[in-house]
Amino acid sequence: MRLKRFLLRYFPPGIILEYEKGGELKTKAIDLLELSPTTDVDLVVGEIQKAEPLITASRTQQVKQLILRLQEKIGQQDSRQFYLFKVLRAHILPLTNVAFNKSGSSFITGSYDRTCKVWDTASGEELHTLEGHRNVVYAIQFNNPYGDKIATGSFDKTCKLWSAETGKCYHTFRGHTAEIVCLVFNPQSTLIATGSMDTTAKLWDIQSGEEALTLSGHAAEIISLSFNTTGDRLITGSFDHTVSVWEIPSGRRIHTLIGHRGEISSAQFNWDCSLIATASMDKSCKLWDSLNGKCVATLTGHDDEVLDVTFDSTGQLVATASADGTARVYSASSRKCLAKLEGHEGEISKICFNAQGNRIVTASSDKTSRLWDPHTGECLQVLKGHTDEIFSCAFNYEGNTIITGSKDNTCRIWR
């Protein structure tokens, strides 16, 4: 084994080792999820050296410099105010979803007008209109981190794969017998998973355009999908009050997470895939041990349905958004509520962390989006201007641009 080079991963903090083994180029990651501005770097370097044979004494200084760079990035204080940069009257009919590519250089909008549009973030110009679906385009996603492909899921029961660069349609995936309402790429960008009102999830092979798997077992529609970081597990959240954990590529159901008393609204893995967070209409969020499928905590406090849940990029914080107009931040390890985000005058349907984990953005039916400090719960800014409820919001990877999507048929870029 011979170490070729180091790659730095800022969020969540880590060092990727590129090495040669038997003539093949391979990579492995050293996760530094606990790294903070006060961490003793020499101690960390020592621990890495003990655990990782590729890091020899001659590399010590290099590794130390990399960790110092990561530390500097984590410690950067960001007091930026966001300003409205562009209002895009994206579609004639209502929007369904908005999503960024990883760098944030472009984003996509889905709509009831049966199209998905690709936009240049810097100029606000439309790059492509992806046409071909025969009904509402509901679920949309880039294959991040690559960002060269887009998947669209439609009420016409099909999923389509497109080139982000040219707008060309590569494949139309047919097989679902009802509307597709969620979809996700696996991290390797070799598979797309789709969830449908027909109670099944399907996996599609990006290369061949063929169906790879059907995951059956839920008793109601599947409305949430999440791959783990390595891509060998997929979770499906359903209106049947349960979440299933599937092994990929075998398609075997490993666990069914039973305990919620209402429909599931969202289900997510944390970064190291040790935990699964589930949000439900039963007003609670639950944390589950992903290895044994046992519930390890029920996060209570909301007075109404929990509509969204998300982890920060390291997996140390869990944030929930509720129909009660508040959001909450919990510690994933202590399971204690760290902050209550209060100020919205309507339900919060979407909540996102920036990659750095020091900001949260929320989307609400009160026509505003708000920016928060997740550690103090302080509202730092109210993004006003939409004239109808906001159902979608997203940060780009750098955290310096936000997009919001509203029922007023506009998409706003804030930077």
Curated annotation (Swiss-Prot):
The record's annotation in SUPFAM superfamilies points to: WD40 repeat-like
| GO BP term, pick one | intraciliary transport
Where is coiled-coil annotated?
A: none
Name the keywords, alphabetized. Cell projection, Cilium, Cytoplasm, Cytoskeleton, Flagellum, Repeat, WD repeat
Q: Which Pfam families match?
A: WD40 (PF00400)
Q: Where are this protein's WD repeats?
A: 90-129, 132-174, 175-214, 217-256, 259-298, 301-340, 343-384, 386-415
Q: What InterPro entries does UniProt report for this protein, alphabetically?
A: G-protein_beta_WD-40_rep, WD40/YVTN_repeat-like_dom_sf, WD40_repeat_CS, WD40_repeat_dom_sf, WD40_rpt
User: Could you tell me which Gene3D superfamilies the record lists for this protein?
Assistant: YVTN repeat-like/Quinoprotein amine dehydrogenase
Query: Family, per the entry?
Result: Belongs to the WD repeat WDR69 family.
Question: What's the protein name?
Answer: Dynein assembly factor with WD repeat domains 1
